[in-house]
Amino acid sequence: MAGQAFRKFLPLFDRVLVERSAAETVTKGGIMLPEKSQGKVLQATVVAVGSGGKGKSGEIEPVSVKVGDKVLLPEYGGTKVVLDDKDYFLFRDSDILGKYVD
């Protein structure tokens, strides 16, 4: 997974640090997919979360995901963060489209 790299970075407020899942490079039938046809990876694993953001009433609202959750991301957005030569992405909690439930 993310190893120790994410421990060097703590998201603030309602920010969520995620590690995108690897794109499928081979079909179930064993056909290798070229990079152009793989599509954008929209699934990720949460590796760190902030403490939450201020709500309308001024109270701190906790982030809706926790470390280890599998989430669905928007096609565009997020801020790329490189930690120990590995790419992570920083999103606002409200930008995350949903989380996968086992």
Swiss-Prot record:
Induction field: By stress.
Modified-residue entries (N-acetylalanine), positions: A2
GO molecular function, one term: ATP binding
Keywords: Acetylation, Chaperone, Mitochondrion, Phosphoprotein, Stress response
Subcellular location: Mitochondrion matrix
Superkingdom in the source lineage: Eukaryota
Function text: Co-chaperonin implicated in mitochondrial protein import and macromolecular assembly. Together with Hsp60, facilitates the correct folding of imported proteins. May also prevent misfolding and promote the refolding and proper assembly of unfolded polypeptides generated under stress conditions in the mitochondrial matrix. The functional units of these chaperonins consist of heptameric rings of the large subunit Hsp60, which function as a back-to-back double ring.
Name this protein carries in UniProt: 10 kDa heat shock protein, mitochondrial
UniProt subunit comment: Homoheptamer arranged in a ring structure. 2 heptameric Hsp10 rings interact with a Hsp60 tetradecamer in the structure of a back-to-back double heptameric ring to form the symmetrical football complex.
Modified residues (N6-acetyllysine): K8, K40, K56, K66, K70, K80, K86, K99
CC annotations in GO: mitochondrial matrix; mitochondrion
Entries under InterPro entries matching the protein: Chaperonin_GroES (IPR020818), Chaperonin_GroES_sf (IPR037124), Chaprnonin_Cpn10_CS (IPR018369), GroES-like_sf (IPR011032)
Transmembrane feature ranges: none
Post-translational modification N6-malonyllysine, affected residues: K40, K54, K56
Annotated positions of the Phosphothreonine modification: T79
KW Nucleotidyltransferase (keyword) present: no
Location of Phosphoserine modifications: S57
Gene that this sequence comes from: Hspe1
Family matches, as PANTHER family: 10 KDA HEAT SHOCK PROTEIN, 10 KDA HEAT SHOCK PROTEIN, MITOCHONDRIAL
Residues annotated with N6-succinyllysine modification: K28, K40, K54, K56, K66, K70, K80, K86
Sequence similarity: Belongs to the GroES chaperonin family.
